[in-house]
UniProtKB/Swiss-Prot annotation:
Highest rank taxon of the organism: Bacteria
Species annotation: Bacillus subtilis (strain 168)
Membrane-crossing segments per the record: 89-106, 111-128, 149-168, 172-194
Name listed for the protein in its UniProt record: Uncharacterized protein YitQ
Main localization, broad class: membrane
Alphabetic keyword roster: Cell membrane, Membrane, Transmembrane, Transmembrane helix
Length: 195
């Protein structure tokens, strides 16, 4: 059984699919992923998987190279990549406007821009499955496609929950709002560390 051949083939296909990605970014992503795949393959070889089962296990855990490349490039293509950069800029502009608008609003409505921003951010996380904004994700290992989708869904729900808490804050005691935010934050980061 030649696990190295399976790893090399997978990495070659992924490298070809990531041709539009900048060289340094592509090399870093491939090097990091190769370490994860190598450890995964070695564990499966010790478990006694055949070469065919090993190939299937790699693709089920890490996705097909084309799917993984599309995910890494923000759903693929240079035009989509440019569009996603515009999307990130749009979110940054929204955050700046939110910060500027806060002192201009009456005190009863100062929570609204932040709640709207959290809702937009939740939609972005749900649709794009971008997890790097969550600090707990950055420090952890590479995750499979299924875990990324699950964490993005839970993260989007978490952000929406925070937005709803902010919208309800005029009707709730400040201590209750603070406790809801603290408990939900702790629960979300506990979820990330367990995953």
């Amino acid at each position: 059984m030649n696990g190295q051949l399976i790893i090399d083939r997978y990495m070659e296909e992924l490298n070809a699919e990531l041709a539009n990605m900048p060289d340094v970014e592509r090399e870093n992503a491939i090097d990091e992923l190769k370490g994860h795949i190598t450890a995964f393959v070695q564990d499966r070889i010790k478990a006694g998987l055949s070469e065919e089962e090993l190939q299937e296990a790699v693709e089920s855990e890490f996705s097909h190279p084309k799917e993984l490349a599309e995910l890494m490039m923000g759903d693929g293509g240079e035009t989509k990549r440019r569009r996603s950069l515009l999307g990130k800029s749009w979110i940054s502009v929204l955050l700046i406007v939110t910060i500027i608008a806060l002192p201009l609003l009456p005190s009863d409505f100062r929570h609204l821009p932040l709640a709207v921003y959290l809702m937009v951010l939740a939609g972005y996380v749900w649709k794009r499955k971008k997890l790097v904004m969550f600090a707990g994700v950055r420090k952890n290992k590479m995750r499979s496609q299924k875990e990324i989708v699950k964490i993005s869904r839970v993260g989007a729900v978490y952000l929406l929950f925070l937005a709803v808490v902010l919208l309800l804050s005029p009707f709730l005691n400040a201590l209750v709002v603070l406790l809801l935010i603290a408990v939900s934050c702790a629960a979300f980061f506990l979820f990330l560390n367990i995953k």
